[in-house]
Amino acid sequence: MLSILTLNIQATSRRRADALLRWLTGRPEQILLLTETSGGDGTAHLLDHFRRAGCQVHHPPLPGDRGTAMISRIPTTARPDITAGLSIPGRAVAATVHTDPPVTVLGVYVPSSDRAPAKVERKRAFLTSLADTLDQLPVDERAHLVLGGDYNVVARDHQPAYPGVWLPFEYALFDTLTAAGLTDAHTHLTPGVQRHSWFGRAGNGYRFDYLHVGTALRDHLHGGDYLQEPREQRLTDHAAVTLDLDLRVDALDVRPAPPVIEPATLF
């Protein structure tokens, strides 16, 4: 079984990083896609822990901006060739996982935007380049693709609806994914169930975080969920998203990360 988890870590501070590590190291997923990483001490501490545990860590540099990292407990081959054409390559990470058959995982952290023209154009450029990247993938690789992360967009049929908030090019992301043959794992597994992965100050829910799979993987979907614990425990402000694919993974390849030691108390 190949299991994948994606989570926006909210540019974790060093103070939050240990608690976040305890949660992540307790998870069974072999691939962790972390979005909104940063160049700060918190992200560095978190990723260094997994490196010391023998995990493979892919974290493209993106000075002064927020990015994406992939942590793998099973062997992977980094694929910077896939992300090179993106308008902001450091906002994505890609690797091919050594499963049977091989699976390519692409994690993205789509830029957020308000109505400031520069931010709108930055987001539009990224989504346009993502569409081009998907279109340029070989057909077989796209069929064995897992795309996931924080898309910073909701679907047209999202509940609650937020009329006037999203621009047509933002909604069009999901048309792009459908045209690429990618299936929303959650919608496939639990049709008609609305989940939320981020909540605004007024308590309004938004589904920003997703996992999509290619046509050859759709029938291998075995399970998945939205996990609210990271948000409820204030480890970050997002829920995690998981999926399980019924694919062969050599058990000898799995590398368990050591537990994070609880801080000592005075009494």
Segments from the language model and where they lie:
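N-terminal, active-site-proximal structural segment of metallo-dependent hydrolase catalytic domains
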Residues: M1-H49, T68, H158, L252-F267
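Active-site beta-strand/loop signature of hydrolases that rely on acidic residues for catalysis
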Residues: I4-N8, W23-G42, V105, L130, ...
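Structured beta-strand-rich core segments of catalytic domains in phosphoester-bond hydrolases
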Residues: I31, E36-R115
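Active site of divalent-metal-dependent phosphoester/diester hydrolases
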Residues: Q56-S72, P168-R218, R231-R234
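Active-site beta-strand termini and strand-to-loop segments that position acidic
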Residues: S72-I74, A95-D100, G203, G214-T215, ...
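Surface-exposed cleft-lining segments at the edges of enzyme active sites
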Residues: T83, V110-T128, H158-Y162
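Short, surface-exposed, charged loop/turn segments at secondary-structure junctions
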Residues: V120-K123, Y151-F174
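Surface polyanion/phosphate-binding segment centered on an Asp-His-Pro turn
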Residues: L227-F267
